[in-house]
Amino acid sequence: MAKNVGILAMDIYFPPTCVQQEALEAHDGASKGKYTIGLGQDCLAFCTELEDVISMSFNAVTSLFEKYKIDPNQIGRLEVGSETVIDKSKSIKTFLMQLFEKCGNTDVEGVDSTNACYGGTAALLNCVNWVESNSWDGRYGLVICTDSAVYAEGPARPTGGAAAIAMLIGPDAPIVFESKLRASHMAHVYDFYKPNLASEYPVVDGKLSQTCYLMALDSCYKHLCNKFEKIEGKEFSINDADYIVFHSPYNKLVQKSFARLLYNDFLRNASSIDEAAKEKFTPYSSLTLDESYQSRDLEKVSQQIAKPFYDAKVQPTTLIPKEVGNMYTASLYAAFASLIHKKHNDLAGKRVVMFSYGSGSTATMFSLRLNDNKPPFSISNIASVMDVGGKLKARHEYAPEKFVETMKLMEHRYGAKDFVTTKEGIIDLLAPGTYYLKEVDSLYRRFYGKKGEDGSVANGH
């Protein structure tokens, strides 16, 4: 049986094109701070016509393979999590198989998992479970979380974003799953869904979605605490997690969610709540569950109490989600990548609790233990390979007008056929070695190219 199964290596790709939220506020005629303070977002990455979830996946996977010297023949399972529908039948995984076919490896299990922002977690758990099972053949698992989050013009548009993350799964990992510490909450709700197959845009009930997120958080945390207490014979509170990483549609929800965990600890009379905090929480002790979700006063008090804990346990996870935006399935893992980027020298022996949410709704809370392994599969090497700071600095800022123009073109192109992408002015923004969409033919078949290391445009997949 494989031991210490978890994440061996990670890499992230996000588009080099972005728009500043402050500029978007002014362009949209929104009140100053609506996006930057109200949502807690700084910047938003987006795909131009040259990029999509498939090209981003190619970039994340090939970069991970090159930097860790992984032979595609070493992969036995490939799982993709995404809610960005390119095709209602053909999976994103099958496009990626081109990287494996040329090496003669077609014996690769797994397909795509889809449920809003949760598919990446389903894909990850599938790979981890496979390595831990009797079915494991000794090869690595590979997980891709890839999404382009776009919204119609209006209040939801600033909560967009785009990215792909690749994770290599195997035994003796620096990031180990505490498999017994996992709790889920599944329910039927219409908080965010995409019933119009002719459009990329969702139908969203923002207020309901926030409540559903918090309900799922409460439920998962309660079950995780119960499981921990059965296994360890002692209580679990936020003090038992060194860091807590949240699915991040926008940063303000992350702040509210962490504060909610402290309120849960108060209701459970956990040791994380001191006397001063108890006094502040007491007026809200008799609220019904529904009342607690609607109480603005409780929300405010909770966040005040949570602030020092938040700064220590959550703030280091927020860089990429604030700078890139909502990456749907990749959001949780981009937040985790932010933690590795910020704290890679201090993570050995630490416990990280992860909370994944997908509308509809699906949610899982799970626990990771981080070890001080030797390179190439080490925490510090993951930070070095991802080069988050370098990638953020290399981006090109678009004016809001150009962003809106790009969104209109992408809206027009969604589900379209028989077109060749315009390279002029955009291809220069892509780094050498980057995969991009070349054309979609009259049969809707998608063809990708790869920018040469010398900047030339080469044929690809």
Swiss-Prot record:
One of its GO terms (molecular function) is hydroxymethylglutaryl-CoA synthase activity. Its EC number is 2.3.3.10. GO terms for cellular component: plasmodesma. The keyword Lipid biosynthesis applies. GO terms for biological process: farnesyl diphosphate biosynthetic process, mevalonate pathway; isopentenyl diphosphate biosynthetic process, mevalonate pathway; sterol biosynthetic process. Coiled coil: none annotated. CDD domains: init_cond_enzymes. (3S)-3-hydroxy-3-methylglutaryl-CoA binds at residues 117, 159, 209, 247, 256, 326, 359. It is an enzyme of class 2 (transferase). It catalyses: acetoacetyl-CoA + acetyl-CoA + H2O = (3S)-3-hydroxy-3-methylglutaryl-CoA + CoA + H(+). The active site is at 83 (proton donor/acceptor), 117 (acyl-thioester intermediate), 247 (proton donor/acceptor). Pathway: Metabolic intermediate biosynthesis; (R)-mevalonate biosynthesis; (R)-mevalonate from acetyl-CoA: step 2/3. Disruption phenotype: Defect in pollen adhesion to the stigma resulting in male sterility under normal growth conditions. Keywords: Lipid biosynthesis, Lipid metabolism, Steroid biosynthesis, Steroid metabolism, Sterol biosynthesis, Sterol metabolism, Transferase. Highly expressed in flower buds, pollen grains and anthers in the tapetal cells, at an intermediate levels in roots and weakly in leaves. The keyword Lipid biosynthesis applies. Belongs to the thiolase-like superfamily. HMG-CoA synthase family. This enzyme condenses acetyl-CoA with acetoacetyl-CoA to form HMG-CoA, which is the substrate for HMG-CoA reductase. Devoided of acetoacetyl-CoA thiolase (AACT) activity. Required for the development of both tapetosomes and elaioplasts in tapetal cells and for pollen viability during pollen tube elongation. This is Hydroxymethylglutaryl-CoA synthase. The gene is HMGS.
